[in-house]
Amino acid sequence: MIEGGFRLPRSCYGSGIVRPLALTLGEPAGIGPDLALAVWCRRGELDLPPFYIVADPEYLARRAGRLGLNVPLAAVTPSAAAPAFRSVLPVVPLELPVTAEPGRADRSSAPAAVASIRRAVGDVMAGAAAAVVTNPVAKNVLYHWGFAEPGHTEFLAKLVHEATGKMLRPVMMLWSPELAVVPVTIHLPLREIFNQLSSELIVETGRIVARDLCLRFGLAHPRLAIAGLNPHAGEEGTLGDEDRAIVAPAVAQLLAQGIDARGPLSADSMFHERARASYDAALCMYHDQALIPIKTLAFDHAVNVTLGLPFVRTSPDHGTAFDIAGTGRADPTSLIAALRLAARLAAAEHAVPLAAS
């Protein structure tokens, strides 16, 4: 299990000591703006690393007023954000005004949400920001606007490709002090998993996870637990042959490449406390196999981490929560964890070399 409690030394938070984190706007009508304002108000109490938000300052000011928060805002460049963080919430301004009302999905806000991501990624790749932390977006709003990528993770890879010409395969890891999980296949109907899952995909995912656990999480010898696809990992073929034909060969290949991997393991007995102590990350074959255990154990403080990118990206592990946007009831725990983890990972390894294609 990856040791939790990642907090940088207090001196790292001082003015000018570190590059700031770039926090995206997310879906403006969701809880992202609420959370950004709320966590800044608690920056001293929580000893947070400095960050700026890429957003429309006037929209943030209106949201702060709605929430009854006294948040001084300052339009800044990334280089001025860290020194300003103690006294104001630094905002790298967007040229796109936002008019969406809290709780009301509005496709007119999609350009600002996308532009915020683009700017944050550009800043971190230029060395102006230490890492990117993304607030949640509303995929249906983006899709209606014409957004072509399946989600945040794939869009980040596209932006890297546009900037560098390198094709990447980003990997989603959900991290908490209790458990780290990686879904090998992500947003697919169950019936499609059998068509998408392959030994090659499992091996590629395992290599990326092992590499980033070394380079960013500081684990000299990462231990991977590989879940089986079928109940009881197939019961020697009596409950499906995929675990013998696909998963087991992938585990053998990972072992041959010097990666500590075990499996296929029966998923129903992988996630209790004693089992979790035996590995650092669990590779799961499909979305719910990974997300159900971590959301059961760490619903409020799990963090989404994108592996395989040349920069650190984290995100709170929750959605836009339109039903409570603008009410002040949103829980900032996951965003706080995402900010802290981003700072810790960026301090450990700010730029990970891309694997040769």
Where do the model's predicted regions map?
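Contiguous, glycine/small-aliphatic-enriched amphipathic segments in soluble metabolic enzymes
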Residues: 2-4, 12-154, 196-285, 289-312, ...
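Small-molecule pocket liners
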Residues: 51, 153, 170-171, 179-182
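A broad structural signal for alpha-helix termini and local helix breaks/kinks
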Residues: 67-68, 160-164, 188, 217
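Short, flexible loop segments at boundaries between secondary-structure elements
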Residues: 158-171, 175-179, 309-323
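Ligand-binding beta-strand-loop-alpha-helix segment within the catalytic cores
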Residues: 174-203
